[in-house]
């Protein structure tokens, strides 16, 4: 089995903005897979991201909804002083500090990040963005710009 045989494009329905989706069978997302192997890969990612002393730095891990939330949760466990948060497509309550950003290619383009502890972001030495796929990086850049505008 070659290194990319677990990847394939699938046809999407009901999304005129994005005709295909990249499916990674090792993620157990959109396609059945081996959960033990999937979790082991998430743990490997967490270990790699925490190398060279990075695991000891104050960290914010942000996982993109909905499909990267499990990956982000596992990754965040490898950082000693970590604040973990996920984005959401749901409208947040009025008491929440919500940072809005867009995922242009999505069927539901408006996303939010609920920031309950702004100081966690200000204290962080590093912020790690976790998604199930980065194709253009546009969504990540949209979030970074929104964070910079709200938490600077």
Each model region followed by its residue ranges:
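PRPP-associated nucleotide enzymes
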Residues: 1-152
């Amino acid at each position: 089995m070659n290194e990319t045989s677990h990847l394939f494009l699938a046809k999407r329905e009901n999304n005129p903005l994005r005709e295909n989706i990249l499916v990674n069978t090792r993620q157990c997302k959109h396609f059945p897979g081996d959960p033990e192997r999937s979790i082991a890969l998430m743990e490997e990612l967490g270990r790699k991201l925490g190398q060279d002393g990075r695991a000891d730095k104050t960290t914010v891990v942000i996982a993109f909804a909905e499909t990267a939330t499990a990956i982000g949760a596992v990754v965040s466990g490898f950082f000693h002083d970590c604040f973990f948060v996920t984005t959401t497509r749901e409208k947040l309550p009025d008491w929440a500090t919500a940072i809005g950003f867009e995922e242009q290619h999505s069927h539901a383009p408006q996303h939010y990040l609920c920031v309950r502890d702004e100081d966690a972001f200000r204290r962080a030495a590093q912020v790690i963005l976790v998604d199930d796929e980065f194709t253009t990086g546009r969504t990540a850049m949209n979030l970074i710009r929104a964070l910079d505008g709200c938490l600077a």
